[in-house]
Amino acid sequence: DYYASRGLGDVYKRQRWGWAIHKYPHYEEVGIEDVTFVGHATDDFQHHRNWAHDGAYKPIKMTRLTNSWMRRVNFISVSEANSITSSANVSAYDIKIDGNRGHAAIRSQGSSRVFIGKVTDRTNGPLIDNRGVIQQGAGQYHACGVSKPSMGAVIWRVHWGLDACFESHATQPRATLIDNCTGGFMQYRQGGDYNQMPNHLADLTLWNFNAKNNVADSPFIWWDNNSLWWKFLPPIVVGYHGGSIHFDESQMKLNEEQGNTVTPYSLYEAQLRKRLGAVPALSLIHI
């Protein structure tokens, strides 16, 4: 090969695939703490009804940040709590979302190594599939999760709503750990347009998820061949318990110990303990 023989293999690859190195303008060590954001989200939320229902009250967004954090923050009646966008090594934890339910909670959007932990979402509003019923603790339509090419996100000890599910908003997020979380497991709440599928690439892992509803869809599929929407590469699910569900295991890498909790109770904490020799005190505080 002409390029390889001259030590120019990397140059060839960049030319062939369009790779390039760019500067990344960003801020470091930005912290948001001890504040409450209050919006006026409607009390009759309907997904994609109009701009006001979907996004009228987005009080804050963390964009192009590294080594930054949000903690001890409350959101009341917001359309969307916080998107962590085009960022790296950002944490958001000890957060409460209350009031009227809205569109989204907290997401890693096109970011790397984002930690979202101990978020409690108890917003109220009409059930998505039965708008005549007002559900206390229904939760944001999209619970905490990922969007765009997010990589290496951890969703840890989050307690989301009864009429919700984790977000996985397509455009190819990958390597997401949903660890020791509790809430509804409502299908088709992940989001994403059909031309942005799949919802998630490889390495989606659900560990010790505690479902607060029984899932009637039988079997529960991860790749819908009859629709342009709803497409996950085979996930790993370990210790799914609480409500009943029948997974199509042919669409999964692993479904282990369904109906039981497993040890370690938190995969993220176990990895921290192995890597650091101890677990930070944060994880000892239970929601």
Label each PLM-derived region with a short phrase.
Residues 16-19, 55, 77-78, 162-163, ...:
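Short alpha-helical segments and helix-capping/turn motifs at coil-helix boundaries
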Residues 13-30, 49-65, 84:
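Extracellular beta-strand-rich solenoid/capping regions of secreted or surface-exposed proteins
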Residues 5, 22, 33, 38-40, ...:
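A structural detector for beta-sheet-dominated domains
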Residues 2-12, 285-286:
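Single conserved hydrophobic/aromatic residue that forms the stacking wall/gate
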